[in-house]
Every structure is written in structure tokens, then in C-alpha cells.
Amino acid sequence: AIAAVITFLILFTIFGNALVILAVLTSRSLRAPQNLFLVSLAAADILVATLIIPFSLANELLGYWYFRRTWCEVYLALDVLFCTSSIVHLCAISLDRYWAVSRALQYNSKRTPRRIKCVILTVWLIAAAISLPPLIYKGDQGPQPRGRPQCKLNQEAWYILSSSIGSFFAPCLIMILVYLRIYLIAKRSNRRGPRAKGAPREGEPKQPHPLPAGPSALANSPTLASSLAVTGEANGHSEPPGEKERETPEDPGTLTLPPSWPVLPNSGQGQKEGVCGASPEEEEECGSPAVPASPALACSPPLQQPKGSRVLATLRGQVLLGRGVGTAGGQWWRRRAQLTREKRFTFVLAVVIGVFVLCWFPFFFSYSLGAICPQHCKVPHGLF
């Protein structure tokens, strides 16, 4: 029964982590640099499932080390290497999450694939530095006990304490502190709410930001009110008395573009003047007899529309909306959505890391007791 369960876990680990690697490498939405951590972590878990767990299962079922002594030493070194790499990967991911939340602008510009690969290489070097000493320095090895051979971890106190601190306790402490800090940052940002600087209040409609009324004012004037003229008098035109009384009332918040706005060339007819009504035919094309406005306002000339902008038609003309309608609010909401995704991902990782720590803590705690008090703190073999 134990062999069947462990075999299922081995296959499930290999299949699940292979899907993670395949998804990150093939999906465009998952090709963010930080997802390289997941690829490397999944590779470490696959190596554990293929090179470590099967031999551990055989050792437990047989009760002795069936394979060669040399492979035992390599097996123990690889065991420490892959397990330490997995834990340190989780520590690196937690630090990446923290910097992405606390220093979003500065860190996201530096989060390049090359930097992430350098961090991953550092993770593997740390794991190698912890796992290789038993292969290089074997210490004073007494005679092998008679009977069936055993394959056990290094029992020297200096290695037990150093490997336990480097492989588990130090990364675990870092992860707990980092995720506590991320929680405090998320809580503080939720208290601030949407009333951040430059952000629209809840229930307040987003107002479009029309562009100024002339090419020279596009780069200098921030609002439409400073550059648009609401009546024809802004261009030197006057309306006959009584014309204003016959005009159809409009939304006071709607502004029109003056006739001085440059027009687009008509196909095959050259550039028109900025004043409408040069001929009866043109008046019929762009004007409407239902709204008897002055010649300057009877119809608005075609807009020279910048790329990405939109035109809003009104009774008294056309309003050119800016390229980013509600740019400040839109940026704020995009930033808020990004932070929400960061927090959700951080929460998922915190759950995964919490379960991981609970699974590893009993082993490292009992393993460390053998170095602290080898005579009085012996852990039962079955529990270990």
C-alpha cells in the first residue's frame, strides 16, 4: 500500500511539474521573467521525484541500502541539493513578490530575464554549497557495521547544524518576515482605498479629456476649456441678434471646436477653408437646416484626427476626445488591477509555502536535535 501511494505521488509530481514548465514556456501570457522561478522550481521537484524518492522508497521497503556505496554518497548529496534548491527557490520567489509590491516602479524596470536567471543561478550555487561538503570532507569514518549496509545522512554536529540552518531555518525565517511585510503593505493600501492622488472617487463618473482646439495648443494646454471657444465670437465672428434664441439647447458640459481647426483634405478637391458654407453645395453637405446657426457654427469642419483619438458628434459640432480618455483614472485602475493580481498571487504562494514549511519542519527539527543533544534527545526511528 505504501509503495502504491508513493508511486502515485511520484507520477503526480512529475506530471504536474512538467505541465507547469510546458505552460510557462508555451503560453505568451506566462512568459513574464518572474515565472522563470517556477520553471526552475518545477525542475528541482522533478529531479527529486525521479532521482531521490524512488531510492528512498527502496531503502525503506528493504530496510537496507541495496545499491553501491558510491551511489549512496552521491544520492545523499543530490538529496540535499534538490531539497535545498526547492526551499531557497521559494525564498527567492517571496523576495521577488515583496520587491514587486513595495518597489513596483523601480523593481519592475529591473526585473529582466537576465537578472532572474542570475538569481536562479545563485539559488543553485547556495544549494550546492550546502550539499557538497560531505562529498569533499568525509571526516573520521569508523568501520562499517557488520550486516546489511545503511545509507544515512552525515551525523557530524557541525554539518547537521549548518545544513539545517542554510537549507531550512534561515529561508523559512526570511519567508515569514517577507510575507508578513507584504501583508502589512496590502492592508495599508486597502485602508487608503481608491482616493489616491489622481484617482477618481467612487461613484464619480470619469470625464473625457478633449484635446485643445488647435495644433499649437495641443502640447501646451492641459484642458479643453483653455483652448476651445464655445461661441463663434472667439474667431471674430458675430451672430445676428435673435440667432442665439433659435439655437437648440445643448448639454452645458459639451464643448465644440472652433472653425479655425485645420480640416482634412477632401479626396480630389484639395484643402478646404476653415469656414463652412463657401457654396450652397458645401452648406448642404455639412450643415443641417433643422439647426439654423450662424455660418461660422452651422457646421463644424472635418477634424484633423490624431491617431488613437475619437470624435464625439454634437448638435453644434464635433468634439475631439483625447487619445487616453480618462488617462489618469485609467492608469490608476490599471495599477490597482496589477496590485490585485500581485496580492492574489502572493496569497497563493503564502498558502503553498505555509504547507511546505509544515511538511519540512518536523524533519529538520528532529534532525537538528541529533546535534544539539545526541544523548538525551533521541527521536524514535519510526517518527524520524
Curated annotation (Swiss-Prot):
Residues 26-36, 96-117, 181-348 are cytoplasmic. It comes from the Eukaryota. Disulfide bonds join 72-151. GO terms for molecular function: alpha2-adrenergic receptor activity; epinephrine binding. GO terms for cellular component: cell surface; plasma membrane. Pfam families: 7tm_1 (PF00001). Residues 63-72, 141-156, 373-381 are extracellular. The chain crosses the membrane at residues 1-25, 37-62, 73-95, 118-140, 157-180, 349-372, 382-384. Keywords: Cell membrane, Disulfide bond, G-protein coupled receptor, Lipoprotein, Membrane, Palmitate, Receptor, Transducer, Transmembrane, Transmembrane helix. Residues 240-249 have a biased composition (Basic and acidic residues). Residues 192-289 are annotated as: Disordered. The record marks 79 as: Implicated in ligand binding. Residues 218-229 have a biased composition (Polar residues). It is a multi-pass membrane protein. One of its GO terms (biological process) is regulation of vasoconstriction. The record marks 163, 167 as: Implicated in catechol agonist binding. InterPro entries: ADR_fam, ADRA2B_rcpt, GPCR_Rhodpsn, GPCR_Rhodpsn_7TM. It is found in: Cell membrane. Alpha-2 adrenergic receptors mediate the catecholamine-induced inhibition of adenylate cyclase through the action of G proteins. Belongs to the G-protein coupled receptor 1 family. Adrenergic receptor subfamily. ADRA2B sub-subfamily. Interacts with RAB26. Interacts with PPP1R9B. Interacts with GGA1, GGA2 and GGA3. This is Alpha-2B adrenergic receptor. It comes from Elephas maximus (Indian elephant). The gene is ADRA2B.
